[in-house]
């Protein structure tokens, strides 16, 4: 914040859209945390090397899960939220995703819109 507010150039890790493919292998609209050159004009991602094969697949899978969860949260339904949860690599089956979602939704019912509860 200081680099931006004070127009004091710095290289910092920032969460930004992957515009221009700063991190190869991810869509331009995927939010990635990469090194950026930051000053009063904003944050400009520094081009990155592709992630190592050992972590690339799971990172792409988690990015897709996060995208699906965000879409469900903004204007989706319970079914969309369950599908998002099922896309998480630690959730083994759709039945487990439904059970997890129902438990989370029940615990957070007062914060959720009705469309995510039915």
Question: Where do the protein language model's features map onto the residues?
Answer:
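Long, compositionally biased stretches enriched for glycine and/or charged residues
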Residues: 1-118
